[in-house]
Amino acid sequence: LGFYGLCYWYTWQVSILGLGPLWMSPNGAMRRKAADALANGGIFAFGLSEKEHGADIYSTSMALAPRGDAFVANGSKYYIGNGNEAAIVSVFGKAADSGEYVFFAADPKRAGYRLVKNVVASQSYVAEFALEEYPVAADEVLARGREAWDASLNTVNVGKYNLGWASIGIC
């Protein structure tokens, strides 16, 4: 894909990041949903960075308020490739009551997921998006606590390395 230009390769690269928390998740139903989406040509997104503090995961302001055995998410993410068309967006946040880290699956087509804008002037779509009273069902939680923290770092470790090659013009 990089042969045709970096913008074509970018969609694939970001999909690798979006799949990281899904592949590492103990949630088998979400892993199967991701596999089905892949088989049908779906792309994925990795909702980690925020406008105010980049990818400083200690400072994430995506808040998940408990609602029974589920959550309601509020917050925004910035510079998220494929954030407009992803089959699944893996989103990192914190439980509002405990501060526990949570990775969950979001759907850009569902109510409460608002695309703010494309933040780049290219054919790639790099989103700023906001979750506003976005319901997160218990079966959409990918990881909690240490597992969520580890999934964020492991995904970056595995998936971001390709961006270095692009930045020096190899792709």
Question: Each PLM stretch: what is its role?
Answer:
Residues 70, 74-114:
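A short core secondary-structure module
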Residues 111-135:
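Flexible, small-/acidic-enriched active-site or ligand-binding loops
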Residues 62-65:
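A structural signal for short hydrophobic beta-strand segments in well-ordered beta-sheet cores
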Residues 52-55, 79-82, 94, 118-126:
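Short Gly/Pro-enriched turn/cap motifs at secondary-structure boundaries
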Residues 160-171:
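Extended amphipathic alpha-helical segments enriched in small hydrophobics
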Residues 128-160:
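A glycine-rich, basic-preceded beta-loop-alpha segment at the flavin cofactor/substrate interface
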